[in-house]
Amino acid sequence: MKMAKRGKKYVEAAKLVDRAAAYSATEAVELVKKTNTAKFDATVEAAFRLGVDPKKADQQIRGAVVLPHGTGKVQRVLVFAKGEKAKEAEAAGADFVGDTDYIGKIQQGWFDFDVVVATPDMMGEVGKLGRVLGPKGLMPNPKTGTVTFDVTKAVNEIKAGKVEYRVDKAGNIHVPIGKVSFEDAKLVENFKTIADTLQKVKPAAAKGTYMKNVTVASTMGPGVRVDVSTLA
């Protein structure tokens, strides 16, 4: 019965959205908040359909960006480092810091963290976790700034609201831009920051329209199409 109830709410909420229209970023954010059916502080997520062919190496898009107002989620950070770098990570506020001790824990099924950072000299060991961390999107990567000796900067940025983005096989990128409790202006600014970042990393080999379609939605709400020109 719960599903039917939720379905009814969703249908009512969806009626408020004109599926044929492309709303301005501000209007879209207002609609997303209005059509949110969740009883919790739902995440607001932006979805970009890009004119790229991810099968081609020169059209893969991956990186990270610090959102000006964060995501509303407190990220738990695990840092693989030793010696002075381990001390730096602890001082920066990392939740877990270690070298090989956490590798065994993870292999046994421990995942009480959201982001993994590793110093380059630890990647030989951390690489053993590729099969476990890779499918969960948790493997440290230089492109997202999570393989670095500057652990202080890495931890600070993650805690400040850094989000990773990666194009999937169909050419889509999904990124959280905050919570429904955020002020409209803050959600719009986060949204525009992501859009601007994706424009800057447009592959030179990408042909035709780059941002084909952009939508925004809350966790359990309907998608709202956005006029790309209002994200500039």
Curated annotation (Swiss-Prot):
Protein name per UniProt: Large ribosomal subunit protein uL1
UniProt KW keywords: Repressor, Ribonucleoprotein, Ribosomal protein, RNA-binding, rRNA-binding, Translation regulation, tRNA-binding
Any GO BP: translation
PANTHER family: 54S RIBOSOMAL PROTEIN L1, MITOCHONDRIAL (PTHR36427), LARGE RIBOSOMAL SUBUNIT PROTEIN UL1M (PTHR36427:SF3)
Gene3D superfamilies in the cross-refs: 3.30.190.20, 3.40.50.790
GO cellular component: large ribosomal subunit
Stated role: Binds directly to 23S rRNA. The L1 stalk is quite mobile in the ribosome, and is involved in E site tRNA release.
Listed HAMAP family: Ribosomal_uL1_B
Subunit details: Part of the 50S ribosomal subunit.
One example GO MF annotation: rRNA binding
Pfam families associated with the record: Ribosomal_L1
Family listed: Belongs to the universal ribosomal protein uL1 family.
